[in-house]
């Protein structure tokens, strides 16, 4: 029985050591996930696959740090794209029937996002 316990502990240790580490969300991921939204937000196309991107981002941003990163990236994008309809950006969560804990706006304080 003692040998079985040692083997079980060894197997568990190996699983912990080789388990993939969770990577933090990056602005590149946020941008690529929401790329289908750009034509819609610039009044150049339909909503299309945008909601799938919004829901995908919501699924990727599981931690407070990830949500703050996503917020910062969205805030930066909202400020840098000329011609972006900020009203559409702010209403995107409700349009796509998702709950994002912050407003997509250049004025959002991302440090307060939980």
Curated annotation (Swiss-Prot):
SS bond list: 27-73, 37-50, 51-96, 71-110
GO biological process, one term: lipid transport
Keywords: Disulfide bond, Lipid-binding, Signal, Transport
CDD domains associated with the record: nsLTP1
Highest taxon listed in the record's lineage: Eukaryota
Molecular function terms from GO: lipid binding
InterPro entries (UniProt xref): Bifun_inhib/LTP/seed_sf, Bifunc_inhib/LTP/seed_store, Plant_nsLTP
Gene3D superfamilies, A to Z: Plant lipid-transfer and hydrophobic proteins
Pfam families hit by this protein: Tryp_alpha_amyl
Record's signal peptide: 1-23
Its job: Plant non-specific lipid-transfer proteins transfer phospholipids as well as galactolipids across membranes. May play a role in wax or cutin deposition in the cell walls of expanding epidermal cells and certain secretory tissues.
PANTHER family: NON-SPECIFIC LIPID-TRANSFER PROTEIN 2-RELATED
Family as reported in the entry's similarity comment: Belongs to the plant LTP family.
Name of protein: Non-specific lipid-transfer protein 2
Species of provenance: Solanum pennellii (Tomato)
């Amino acid at each position: 029985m003692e040998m079985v316990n040692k083997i079980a502990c060894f197997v568990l240790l190996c699983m912990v050591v080789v388990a993939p580490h969770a990577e933090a969300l990056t602005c590149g991921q946020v941008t690529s996930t929401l790329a289908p939204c750009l034509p819609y937000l610039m009044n150049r196309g339909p909503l299309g696959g945008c909601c799938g991107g919004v829901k995908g981002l919501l699924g990727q941003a599981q931690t407070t740090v990830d949500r703050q990163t996503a917020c910062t990236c969205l805030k930066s994008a909202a400020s840098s794209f000329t011609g972006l309809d900020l009203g559409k950006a702010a209403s995107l969560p409700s349009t796509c029937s998702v709950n994002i804990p912050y407003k997509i706006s250049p004025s959002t304080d991302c440090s307060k996002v939980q």
